[in-house]
């Protein structure tokens, strides 16, 4: 039984291209230092002594920067290619983190977090296009999952390591996070070669047709419309944004809930939160390998949204069950993440033409970036006005909206 399980686990990784593995290692190195974002709410309220509302505004500035960065990242990827965009954003991300370490003023922090959000999210469209370029239809969903496994392993390291580093001083979170950005950029530059892609600087080649005439191969692409005019894709983006706003509470408000209601310290919060990353890391690839062809992607996405709703409603039960509820939440929200994110990302990469891939993936990234504006703002304001319990019910209600949106999209595809 154990051998069979191990075999299934290893089989789920077979066939994934070497370049995707390298991209995953780059993300592993980079995200292992993502301690600042994981502990940002606690840093602002505990170390800098901002109230929950002010902290929410600063967190939303990170989200605003993320939206700008996602849009610019898509444009730059289409124009310059995914390779340059990735390593440049990593370098500037590291520089930004080291600068923000010295900021204490509210408005200066807002500007600093906007910049960090920009360079952080500009990386994502380029990274998604890179995975598509180095994978095929058979391995794409698993390639996306491998990337997420790497990210979740890294987040687990960041949560546990960050909780321990806080004891040495908050500045060490920024120092280590910056170092991992520089390390990831160095590995990308020295270990991965860029694959030629269609872009503004590398237009599609002319191809010969009958009678010796040449035509631009892009002119025969039947799907070159803008992502911003693709109504079906925009419905997908809206539903993704709603679902992401629910999921992002795990980052922005759940740590504050653990500290304020359950009374846990940073090390305990980091250890409990790491369950999410460990669960995704160990379960996602084998599970995706077994189920990816069983049903259509939207079916799994809707199942994941239901898991989100159930996980947050668990917090409405008495705090005397804190340990059981926290573990249940982390496991349930992890399954939601496993069902939602790889299948939605894989679906998104199949939309639009190759020349528009940066634009399509930028819009997908913008959905998550926008949620990074709305999620902390909504969460902190609801908490301040009505308390944590109200936030969990609001999260469940938003999950229902996302569920209906993906369901309607599924019906459109069946026509």
Go through each PLM region and give its residues:
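Helix-breaking motifs and short loop linkers at transmembrane-helix boundaries and internal kinks
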Residues: 49, 81, 102-107, 317-320
């Amino acid at each position: 039984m154990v051998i069979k399980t191990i075999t299934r686990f290893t089989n789920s990784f077979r066939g994934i291209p070497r370049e995707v593995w390298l991209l995953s290692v780059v993300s592993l190195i980079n995200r292992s230092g993502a301690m600042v974002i994981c502990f940002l709410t606690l840093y602002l309220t505990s170390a800098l002594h901002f109230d929950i509302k002010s902290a929410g505004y600063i967190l939303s500035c990170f989200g605003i920067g993320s939206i700008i960065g996602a849009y610019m990242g898509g444009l730059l990827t289409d124009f310059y290619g995914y390779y340059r965009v990735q390593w440049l954003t990593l370098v500037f991300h590291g520089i930004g983190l080291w600068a923000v370490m010295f900021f204490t003023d509210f408005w200066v922090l807002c500007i600093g977090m906007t910049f960090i959000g920009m360079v952080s999210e500009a990386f994502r469209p380029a990274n998604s296009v890179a995975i598509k370029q180095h994978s095929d239809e058979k391995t794409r969903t698993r390639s996306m999952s491998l990337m997420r496994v790497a990210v979740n392993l890294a987040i687990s390291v960041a949560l546990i390591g960050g909780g321990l580093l806080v004891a040495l001083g908050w500045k060490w979170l920024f120092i280590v996070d910056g170092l991992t950005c520089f390390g990831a950029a160095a590995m990308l530059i020295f270990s991965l070669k860029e694959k030629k892609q269609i872009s503004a600087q590398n237009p599609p080649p002319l191809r010969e047709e009958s009678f010796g005439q040449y035509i631009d191969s892009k002119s025969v692409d039947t799907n070159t419309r803008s992502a911003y005019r693709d109504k079906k894709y925009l419905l997908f983006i809206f539903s993704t944004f709603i679902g992401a706003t629910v999921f992002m509470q795990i980052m922005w408000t759940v740590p504050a809930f653990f500290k304020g209601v359950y009374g846990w310290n940073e090390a305990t919060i980091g250890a409990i939160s790491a369950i999410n990353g460990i669960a995704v890391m160990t379960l996602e690839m084998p599970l995706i390998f077994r189920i990816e062809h069983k049903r259509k992607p939207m079916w799994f996405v809707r199942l994941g949204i239901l898991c989100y709703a159930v996980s947050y409603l668990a917090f409405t039960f008495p705090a005397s069950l804190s340990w059981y509820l926290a573990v249940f939440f982390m496991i349930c929200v992890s399954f939601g993440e496993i069902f939602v994110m790889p299948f939605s990302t894989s679906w998104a990469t199949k939309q639009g033409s190759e020349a528009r891939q940066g634009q399509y993936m930028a819009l997908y990234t913008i959905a998550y970036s926008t949620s990074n504006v709305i999620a902390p703002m909504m969460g902190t304001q609801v908490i301040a006005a009505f308390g944590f319990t109200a936030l969990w019910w609001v999260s469940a209600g938003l999950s229902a909206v996302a569920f209906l949106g993906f369901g309607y999209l599924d019906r459109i595809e069946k026509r």
